[in-house]
Regions:
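Expand to "…catalyze enediolate/carbanion chemistry for C-C bond making/breaking, isomerization
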Residues: 1-304
Length: 304
């Protein structure tokens, strides 16, 4: 109980820190193996919003140290343009995690992804090490939630530190832990994390789709994820990037409607009208807020 109280106290004290999370679009975030130099080089030309250079699942045990050095050198070399670059380290509970973090924290990456997050104190420890290593104060932490304990502690995890800016669903590991095989069986878990992420205004990304040849099924899952409230999706193959970017971006019709709703509302305010309608539907302030969010997202996407 004492440890939990101290952890939550640290979270709330850090919440006042002047950290501003990135507003970069994260429709498509592609995992790339950190042991594959050719793949990481290819990532510089892919239309993904972000890349996760992976030191964890995608790297064999006998390649861990080599991959760590390769990723560090690759990120320091740069050349990724406006793409966000995140490095997924091994868990700090493994023999490689802390060495990963201490080497890449100051590499210039945009974020560090921490796997199998189950408690706020794991995030606090990463933050502490990043500070010790001279990481850029703007470098974010992205937390992967992929276990039952992580799901049930989602509120604590999402509420911990402004720097902990993005939540990623680890659906493959979660399916294994729950011994389930269908997307439907994960619905409660997904929605619990989405609720917690939205409560604290965090970006939340859906997990990967494993059948890379089933593009129809992939698009269906993207559409479903957007409907749930996910901001984007993590990917394992470049062939799925274009679909993801299209699904998680506002459509032309959505942009047009958003622009018109904002205009109608402001015109009504100027003319002293109390009731505003658009296409026969009542427009309230909440609709204007939603429309402004769509326009902001559209403008950010147009810049990349």
């Amino acid at each position: 109980a004492a440890r939990q109280t101290a952890t939550l106290s640290r979270c709330f004290s850090e919440a006042a820190a002047p950290f501003v999370a990135s507003n970069h679009p994260r429709r498509s975030v592609l995992y790339m193996p950190g042991s594959n130099a050719r793949a990481m080089e290819k990532g510089k030309k892919l239309p993904a919003d972000g890349l996760i250079l992976d030191l964890e699942d995608a790297v064999a045990i006998n390649m861990k140290e080599t991959a760590r050095k390769m990723v560090n050198e690759q990120v320091r070399k740069g050349g990724y343009g406006l793409r966000e670059i995140c490095i997924r380290i091994n868990s700090l509970d493994t023999p490689w995690g802390e060495d990963d973090l201490r080497l890449v924290a100051s590499s210039g990456c945009d974020a560090i992804a921490l796997p199998k997050v189950e408690r706020a104190d794991q995030i606090l420890k990463v933050d502490q090490i990043m500070r010790e290593c001279g990481a850029n104060p703007k470098t974010e932490i992205w937390s992967l939630i992929e276990t039952p304990r992580g799901i049930l502690n989602a509120d604590e995890i999402c509420g911990c530190l402004p720097r902990n800016a993005c939540i990623i669903m680890g659906t493959s590991d979660l399916s294994k832990e729950l011994n389930v095989h269908s997307r439907r069986a994960l619905m409660t878990s997904l929605q619990l994390v989405i609720l917690a992420a939205k409560k604290y205004n965090k970006v939340v990304l859906d997990g990967v789709y494993l059948d890379v040849k089933d593009l129809e099924g992939f698009e269906k899952e993207c559409l479903e994820g957007k409907e749930f409230g996910f901001d984007g999706k993590t990917l394992i193959h470049p062939s799925t990037i274009d679909i993801t970017n299209r699904v998680f971006a506002p459509s032309e019709q959505e942009v047009e409607d958003a622009r018109n709703i904002i205009q109608c509302f402001h015109d009504a305010e100027k003319n002293g009208k109390g009731v505003v309608t658009y296409k026969g539907k009542l427009v309230e302030n909440l609709h204007v807020v939603m429309a402004e969010k769509i326009m902001k997202q559209h403008e950010l996407i147009e810049k990349i």
